[in-house]
Amino acid sequence: MEERRLGPVIGLGTWNTFGTDARLAADVVGASLDAGVRVFDSSPMYRGAEASLAAAVGQRRSEATVATKIWAASVDEGREQYRRQREWFGRVEIEQIHNLLAWRAQLEWLEHEKKEKRIDKLGVTHYAPSAFGEVAEALRTRRFDVVQLPYNPREREVERELLPLPAELGVAVIVMRPLGEGALVRRTPSERDLAPLRAFGVETWGQALLKWVLSDERVDLAIPATSRPERPAENAAAGEPPWFGPDERALVERLST
């Protein structure tokens, strides 16, 4: 799998996946590690997914990059979330402020943790285009290393409004919802429609969508979520070049409508 600034370009999201199901988490996370996935994204918002992820990583913790979040309106609550994360994971490689919630207040103490080398990178996330102006404001402080945003053939606001800024500032980009939270893969194009993409290593529609995202070289990592242990290997295969050119990206866009 190709590597960019955050490691292998396909990670694993945990929103609406295994939750508190420890056995399913172990299967999905184990299959992901076996497939070369290294970045695992989670949040206190994800209904027990952090604890399940920690247990699933287990003895293979050294192979994983944990990208989790602080989702708290107060500093005290944020510090408590972080305390639990340290108990579960030992340290946090990428700590993100979820949906900009109290980001100025949380950033103060998180920067101290980064200075003490208990966190490698600090990030900020948001899912809504209406918040992209504030995301840009946060990035312009030059205090963040990573930004996480939605991007897929149906959600392209970031192309115009945000992706140029991280590229200018040297901020790494994580893409959430590369499959549109599953909506884009519910209808699969025909074999004939996908035929022009075979030369790029595409065997499935899901791979076409992931390769569409990663063919934008401003993107460092895509984090498709799954609760199916057979899926990580398929997703990881989409992280290999060659990448799409304008014609192939346009085809995927047409097939996504």
Where are these predicted regions, by residue range?
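Hydrophobic packing residues within well-ordered alpha-helices of enzyme cores
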Residues: 53-56, 110, 135-138, 166, ...
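Flexible loop residues that form catalytic
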Residues: 15, 45-48, 100, 127, ...
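Short Asp/Glu-rich motifs
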Residues: 51-52, 132-133, 185-186, 216
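Glycine/proline-rich, positively charged
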Residues: 20-23, 30, 34, 65, ...
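N-terminal binding-site loop/beta-alpha segment at the start of enzyme catalytic domains
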Residues: 1-64
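Conserved beta-strand positions
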Residues: 12, 42, 68, 94-97, ...
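Structured C-terminal cap/extension of enzyme domains
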Residues: 33, 37-38, 141-146, 161-257
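Alpha-helical elements of Rossmann-like donor-binding domains used by nucleotide-donor carbohydrate transfer enzymes
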Residues: 27-28, 52, 84, 109, ...
